[in-house]
Amino acid sequence: MNRILRLYAFLLPLLAAVFVFEFGVNVPYWDEFEFAGMMSGGPGFWKYITAPHNEHVMPLGKLAYYALARLTSMDSKAMMYLSVIILSIPYLLLVRRIRTHDLMAAAATVLIFFTAFFSPRSCVNLLWGFQPPYLAAFSFGILAILSCDWFLRTRNGWHLLAASLCCTAASLCSAHGLLSWVSVALAAIYSRQFRKCLASLAPAAIIAACYLVSARHFPPAAGGGGVSPAGS
């Protein structure tokens, strides 16, 4: 049974890759047309990077998408495969982490959840080429959870600091800024637990302040639609 579950766990991301191979096409979607304007890296490049995209503040995600677009020559299907890889890494880490402690827990939680997550209906979302920044945010969130788990088991302060950095990175990839507040809390615990100077709070506090300023000056459009100021 152990081998069957392990084989099943590793087959799920492979099936997602087969789905992309079968149904993916190199055709940009709506947001990708807007992002294509910055691919040249022209004079308004950095202004576009720092401007909100709808309700998202995602400079790290935009930079990642820019790099991927240049690397793949704006090949949407190549980015679909990359989306599968980005999803598979934290998934396999979760399977390995839980399996080492309780096989039934892995079967009842991770495998059941990802069976739905990698199902053909969910894999339709992978056919949107502009997924890597959002999936990177998801992956950083999973890594933050794993880092907190490692901290609880080992009491190693570096794991808690890694969780804080993962939360900040997730917020900068595509989140609405909520995870930046988690990173502040984790940094505060790190500072208190290990008697570090309060300077360890500075990066997370700056990120949170940037989100507050951005939310004040660039509120999301009604219904979450519209385009970013730089793209209008």
Please report, for each region that a protein language model flagged, where it lies by residue.
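Membrane-proximal lumenal/periplasmic loop motifs of glycosylation machinery
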Residues: F23-P28, G42-R70, M74-M80, V84, ...
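Transmembrane alpha-helices of multi-pass, membrane-embedded glycan-processing enzymes
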Residues: Y65-A69, M79-L93, P133-F140
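Aromatic- and kink-enriched transmembrane "portal" helix at the membrane-lumen/periplasm boundary
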Residues: A107-F140
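Specific aromatic-rich, kink-prone transmembrane helix
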Residues: I112, P133-R153, W181
